[in-house]
Amino acid sequence: GKSTLLKDLYTSWLKENGVPEDHILFLSLDKDENAECLDPLVLGQRVRSWCRGKDRCYVFLDEIQRVHAIHNPIFHEGKHLLAKPSDEDAITFVSTVLGLSDEKNIDLYLTGSNSKMLSSSIATEFRGKSTNISMGPLSFSEFASYRKEHPFLALQEYLKYGGMPQVVLAGKKKKKTILKSLFDAVYFKD
């Protein structure tokens, strides 16, 4: 889906168009090796440090909604304590993103996949500094043009398995496993 689109397709396009690989940062915030970046202040520091000295850097923050809100450490003896996003002194991923978006050399891309990212207030929070692109499953028309088979057979397949790109590309044996995994991820995590 969106992560693959950004990581594989867009970063490949950037490289093909002359952007050096060391000017592209892709942080998957759902991976354990990036756990420290779930603190919004650490995330901001890491990105700024990585971009320092580069004329232009492309930063992809995948699953940004996983970044925790913290209380401002200035008011808590320097400690980074979890907060609710609504707490008066909370520092959230939105604060970090707004700060990073002010950096002249950073081209910033975010992905998110749950109800926090679907909120109509996100556009308000980003103060007109964002463009929202929603991704959904393939339409039947897209699915049928990809499958290139009799429309009735394509419809049967589409009704049975749907149009999630990962499922469409999988072999018959893997389709159910992928769908169950997607269902569990959405139902239990979101």
What are these regions (language model features)?
Residues 5-9:
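Hydrophobic positions on the alpha1 helix immediately C-terminal to the Walker A/P-loop
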Residues 11-23:
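Post-Walker A helix-loop "phosphate-sensing" segment adjacent to the P-loop in P-loop NTPases
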Residues 25-55:
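Short glycine-rich substrate-engagement loop in P-loop NTPases that contacts/grips substrate
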Residues 27, 59-62:
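Hydrophobic positions in the central parallel beta-sheet of the AAA+
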Residues 36-37, 65-96, 120-121:
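Conserved ATPase-coupling elements of RecA-like P-loop NTPase cores
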Residues 60-61, 107-113, 134:
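Structural recognition of the conserved hydrophobic beta-strand(s) that form the central parallel beta-sheet
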Residues 115-131, 147-148:
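Short regulatory helix/loop adjacent to the ATP-binding pocket of P-loop NTPases
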Residues 134-190:
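Interdomain hinge/linker elements that couple catalytic modules in large macromolecular machines
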